[in-house]
């Protein structure tokens, strides 16, 4: 006998009950005020349920409790915390307050709406590669997310050592599409170190987060940039059959680059869904389309074969790259398919 399918409301209640049971089982140390030292500044370098690792200004990391009013605390948050005079059950302090964020990286969740996964990000490094496949569509999806979140992007094309001269010219011409839009593009190889000094310079004095599909070499790049020996960002062997790497990072964590700057490695960036956006937001996410918004003959213009479409006219004049225009419509189509498949609508929020 087949199981009865749960409704969306039932699924949310099951998930909420599960989270409540998990929280009840967590070891929670209760501090008396007399057991705590003076308040000081720190940064969250990782979050685990009701605990967080806080790096103090002297670089020492402390495992801390989190005040119940700070449930949305994420890696990268600047906080005020108080150390305990002695460690209690492995906990050495408590996070008391969080400073306002200048940016927050979020992702959509079918049950909980928009969830923060990292804070105070200065740039999103979009890593792509010629293998397993160079996908401009994936790059454009990440760019839409960056524009929507108002976080500066940096496009990094990895594994360029695998290109011959002719292929490199072709790929370089594709990257000119983004350079023409004033997006920064770096072509690198973690194997030969080509372009790595330029990448290090772009990462200095900033908090970055790396985004990209499995197999493009994110972990290999990060391990090289971080010069990690014992403590490495995990990466599995690439499958001989699929050519896709297996992502094994499970919790967001902030690392310091030896050349300056920081990176937050987070599994959440693999799940940059756009299905929660409105079509108008996607249009604005393509920066070259913004100037034509509101100029079409009809207000409900779909920017396809509609008469009087300002975007199509710009495409005909060569003011918009065909590749970007095609990806724009692919993204809108995929969003509509996901919403239909998941039964998502504004009333579900």
UniProtKB/Swiss-Prot annotation:
- Please list where the region (Disordered) is annotated: 1-29
Record PROSITE patterns: ENGC_GTPASE, G_CP
Q: What compartments host this protein?
A: Cytoplasm
Composition bias type Basic residues, residue spans: 1-11
Q: Name one GO biological process term.
A: ribosomal small subunit biogenesis
The domain of life for this entry's organism is Bacteria
Question: CP-type G domain: which residues?
Answer: 102-272
Provide any one GO MF term from the record: GTP binding
GO CC annotation terms, alphabetical = cytoplasm
Any Pfam family hit: RsgA_GTPase
Its biological purpose is as follows:
One of several proteins that assist in the late maturation steps of the functional core of the 30S ribosomal subunit. Helps release RbfA from mature subunits. May play a role in the assembly of ribosomal proteins into the subunit. Circularly permuted GTPase that catalyzes slow GTP hydrolysis, GTPase activity is stimulated by the 30S ribosomal subunit.
On assembly, the entry states: Monomer. Associates with 30S ribosomal subunit, binds 16S rRNA.
Its name, as the record gives it, is: Small ribosomal subunit biogenesis GTPase RsgA
Gene name, per UniProt, is: rsgA
